[in-house]
C-alpha cells in the first residue's frame, strides 16, 4: 500500500498495519481524482516553494478569480462558512454550530466552477490557466468525536479537498 511505503509518512507511527486498512476498505477501488491530484500538487508546492499563496474563497467565482490572478491554492475558512456560506442559510459564530455538510458543499461548488472554466478554456483552444487549484479546507475541530470527524473528512475528500486542517481542541472548548 502506497500509504505505508511513501517517505511522506516517515516518522509517523501507526498502531495498525496496511493489511488492517485493506481489510476495512472493501473491494471497490474508488478514486477521488480532484482530491488526489490536488493533494499531489499541494504537497509538491509545500516541498518546493518558499510559500504557497492562497486567499479565502466562499464561492466558485471568487476561486476562479484567484486562479486567473495566479494564486497557488484556495483556502476555505470555517469561520467564513459559518458566517456566510453554510447550508442553514444562517449567520453563526465560529463555534461549529453550522451543518457539517456546509464545507464539503462549498468545496464541490468551487470544483464545479473549476471544471466548467477548464472545459471552456479547452474548447476555446487555450490552456494558459491551471484552474484546478488545490483547496485547503477548515474542518474546525471535527464536529464531534472520531466517527464524526471521519465522516466529515470523507465528504471533504469526495468533494475534492486537497488538504484539510483540524483544530487541536475539543468542539466544546471553542471560543
Predicted regions and their residues:
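Alpha/beta enzyme core
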Residues: 2-175
Amino acid at each position: 500500500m502506497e500509504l505505508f511505503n511513501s517517505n511522506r509518512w516517515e516518522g509517523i507511527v501507526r498502531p495498525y498495519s496496511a493489511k488492517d486498512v485493506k481489510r476495512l476498505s472493501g473491494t471497490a477501488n474508488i478514486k477521488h481524482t480532484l482530491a488526489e491530484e490536488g493533494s499531489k500538487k499541494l504537497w509538491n508546492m509545500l516541498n518546493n516553494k518558499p510559500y504557497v499563496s492562497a486567499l479565502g474563497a466562499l464561492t466558485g467565482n471568487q476561486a476562479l478569480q484567484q486562479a486567473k490572478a495566479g494564486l497557488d491554492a484556495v483556502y476555505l475558512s470555517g469561520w467564513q462558512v459559518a458566517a456566510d456560506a453554510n447550508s442553514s442559510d444562517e449567520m453563526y459564530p465560529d463555534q461549529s454550530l453550522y451543518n457539517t455538510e456546509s464545507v464539503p458543499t462549498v468545496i464541490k461548488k468551487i470544483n464545479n466552477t473549476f471544471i466548467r472554466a477548464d472545459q471552456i478554456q479547452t474548447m476555446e483552444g487555450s490552456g494558459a490557466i491551471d484552474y484546478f487549484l488545490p483547496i485547503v479546507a477548515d474542518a474546525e475541530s471535527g464536529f464531534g468525536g472520531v466517527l464524526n470527524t471521519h465522516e466529515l473528512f470523507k465528504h471533504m475528500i469526495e468533494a475534492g479537498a486537497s488538504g484539510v486542517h483540524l483544530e487541536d481542541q475539543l468542539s466544546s472548548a471553542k471560543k
